[in-house]
Amino acid sequence: GADFVFHCAANTSGAAVMARTPLVHVTPNVVMNTYLLEAAYEASVKKFIFISSGAAYPPTGDRPVEEEEMFNGDPEDVYFPVAWMKRYSEILCRTYATKLSVPMSTLVIRPSNIYGAYDKFDFDTSHVTAALIRRVVERHNPFEVWGTGEDIRDLIFIEDFIDGLMLAVKKCNFYDEMNICSGVGVTIKQILQTALLVDHFDNAHVQFNPDKPSTTPVRLMDNSRLKERLGFQPKISLSEGLGRAIQWYRKHPFAN
């Protein structure tokens, strides 16, 4: 049997779909997560790694949220159904690790906004960074950005995320929870300006549309546990990461 199961699959979409159909991701993900945990347990898997989400946290404003704060309050309304789906799946992970006579070690990973190669670039299902990257590569002009551009996110490049993930798998045992993030907040406007700069899209006429759906104004995550317990620090800067992601998508324009 398998020593490790990395449960990275999820039914996801962007802000527009979530605004139209708030419950669309609840049932598919709850069913999938429940069956995968059950199958892993029956197969005597040594460690089950569940990729949760930083969006499940309660709002903490401009203060980075820490791991132990997950259940300190309700998640934000815009994420409410999806966030509680993630929280329920985390509780299932904790149950398998701590409430059974024969436990299965589980690890809950809460990433910030991951970006890079093999992301979802379809506008209906992509998150904001991938959508911006696609518009940059396709040279949209005028360049429409949903929202005001002032929303703040924590971005982590996919290779940094994987490095942090593998370190957590190696060093965390029994049951644990870990934020994997950069610990640095950037605005959507800064992400866009960096992407335009690294790809030399100098004549872009950017139009911010505050009437279009967006999610939360600020989402920051604390990476102290990641640094102190695992000795991990992301290596890829925003400009390097966006440059590499843009080049990847340019070579794979149908990867939507």
Report residues per predicted region.
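NAD(P)H-binding glycine-rich loop region in Rossmannoid oxidoreductase-like domains
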Residues: 1-29, 39-42
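Conserved Rossmann-fold NAD(P)-dependent oxidoreductase catalytic core, especially the SDR/UDP-sugar
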Residues: 7, 34-79, 99, 107
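Active-site beta-alpha turn of Rossmann-fold NAD(P)-dependent dehydrogenases/reductases
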Residues: 9-10, 49-53, 110-112, 149, ...
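Short beta->alpha connector loops of Rossmann-like oxidoreductase domains
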Residues: 12-14, 57-58, 116
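NAD(P)-dependent short-chain dehydrogenase/reductase
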Residues: 61-64, 68, 91-170, 183-185, ...
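Active-site helix of classical SDR
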Residues: 81, 85-88
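C-terminal substrate-binding subdomain of Rossmann-fold SDR/epimerase-dehydratase oxidoreductases
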Residues: 138-256
